[in-house]
Regions:
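Substrate-agnostic recognition of the 12-TM MFS/MFS-like secondary transporter fold
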Residues: 18-71, 111-169, 209-218, 232-284, ...
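Membrane-helix interface/capping residues of multi-pass secondary transporters
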Residues: 50, 80-81, 140, 173-175, ...
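C-terminal ends and interior cores of transmembrane alpha-helices
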Residues: 89-108, 284, 300-316
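Symmetry-related core transmembrane helices of the 12-TM Major Facilitator Superfamily/SLC fold
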Residues: 86-95, 175-194, 298-300, 319, ...
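C-terminal transmembrane helical hairpin of 12-TM major facilitator-type secondary transporters
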Residues: 295-335
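Cytoplasmic membrane-interface "Motif A"-like loop-to-helix N-cap segments
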Residues: 76-90, 171-177, 282-302
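Helix-loop junctions at membrane interfaces in 12-TM secondary transporters
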Residues: 100-116, 195-199, 310-325
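Juxtamembrane intracellular "pre-TM" segments in multi-pass secondary transporters
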Residues: 1-14, 203-229
Length: 401
């Protein structure tokens, strides 16, 4: 056992798998999710009016309902690696096609909405596949040691990609940065090729593909799923409100300056990533091992509540509006996701992937769409501080659960 493995308290055989999954996490979260969301947001907000903002919350969940329903069926029949390869190839083709279209018409509402929807769907599938694949690689006992470690890729990606995007924002067209997503998808496929033979369920793939897909009754009656679903839905509502608050503040501050907006968002990701690094490497692992999943899930609502109070006290200053979203960045892809996915481990492997697809693709999108309709109804004239009040109420409900 190497010094690094002893320092990280990894058992023999865990180090190689954990290292490859850190790379997978870096590519998925940094190269696909962060790059896609920042570039898509800058293109959207700098080219379209404030009245269009609610559509970037309304359209993605509606499309995700259809995509997730299809994915849930395929997940019960095809192996996880095969699904990862298909998603990577189709996503890369779509991104390259969209980049060409942006060179023709960069202010099209249809194209920019389509791009945002496409990026959102890709991001949802990529992170879903990351965690289900990680669940196939590690037992429940191994996961308690390894899951906080493999999320280090998510933490580092905020630093690396946030700083990188901020540095090049003033000299590179935002649309060209979409090519980073293509390269990251290639990395994801490569890591999957390397680790596919080591999955715990590799020997039972043929049986799982031929077995009956879990029914809705199976999904609804498992004792853990209602609690997990409730947490996911609350996180969705609060995160989307925080994101909408930031959209309103960004557009009022930067207007049509897409490069300035991207530079700010890159810096925002960098500083959030710095906080996430401190949490990930100094706190997360020991917190989960000593106090368990409950403590890990409690940090995010407390941080968002503090950010909402800052919005109210400062009258909606840009830095204050960034705090709830920053809390989401610091905690969601680190200790919160690790804690939430530990809750999935007692669920049988035959049910786990379909359960995640059911929660993320069937339950969550209608809730997000309903919230977007509320954004449309209220209108962009509503200030970020007005939205801070319902966030505080929802956080109290979250902590009660």
């Amino acid at each position: 056992m190497t010094f690094l493995s002893r320092w990280l308290r990894l058992q023999p055989g865990e180090g190689s798998r954990a290292g490859w999954m850190v790379l997978y996490s870096l590519a998925a979260v940094g190269g696909v999710i962060i790059t896609g969301s920042l570039v898509g947001r800058a293109l959207f907000l700098s080219a379209l009016p404030a009245e269009a903002i609610p559509y970037k919350y309304l359209l993605p969940p509606l499309v995700l309902i259809v995509v997730s329903a299809l994915y849930a069926r395929l997940a019960a029949r095809w192996s996880r690696p095969r699904l990862i390869y298909i998603v990577c190839v189709l996503s890369a083709v779509g991104i390259l096609s969209t980049r060409w279209l942006l060179s023709v018409e960069s202010h099209s509402f249809t194209l920019l909405c389509g791009l945002y929807v496409f990026i959102d769907v890709i991001s949802a599938l990529v992170i879903l596949q990351f965690w289900t694949f990680a669940g196939d690689l590690f037992t429940a006992r191994e996961a308690r040691r390894v899951f906080p470690l493999i999320t280090a890729g998510s933490t580092l990606s905020n630093l690396v990609f946030g700083l990188g995007l901020s540095a090049v924002a003033s000299s590179v067209d935002p649309g060209d940065l979409l090519l980073i997503m293509v390269g990251s998808l290639v990395v994801i496929a490569g890591v999957t090729v390397r680790l596919a033979p080591e999955t715990i369920s590799a020997s039972t793939d043929n049986e799982s593909r031929q077995s009956r897909p879990p029914s809705r009754i199976d999904l609804r009656t498992h004792p853990l799923l209602p609690t997990i679903a409730g947490l996911v839905l609350l996180v969705t509502i609060i995160s989307n409100i925080a994101d909408y608050q930031l959209d309103l503040a960004l557009q009022r501050h930067y207007g049509d300056d897409g490069r300035g907006m991207l530079a700010f968002l890159g810096s925002f990701r960098f500083w959030s990533g710095l906080g996430a690094c401190a949490l990930q490497f100094l706190v997360a692992r020991r917190l989960l091992e000593r106090f368990g999943v409950g403590a890990g899930l409690l940090l995010l609502p407390v941080a968002i509540a503090g950010g909402s109070m800052a919005i109210l006290l400062t009258g909606g200053a840009l830095w204050a509006v960034s705090v709830p979203r920053g809390s989401d960045v610091v905690l969601k892809y680190t200790i919160h996701d690790a804690s939430l996915n530990l809750l999935f481990l007692p669920i049988p492997d035959s049910l786990r992937a379909s359960a995640k697809a059911w929660i993320d693709g069937i339950l969550r999108p209608p809730v997000a769409a309903a919230l977007a309709l509320m954004f449309l109804w209220v209108g962009p004239e509503t200030t970020p501080q007005a939205w801070a009040i319902p966030v505080l109420v929802l956080v109290m409900v979250w902590m009660w659960l």
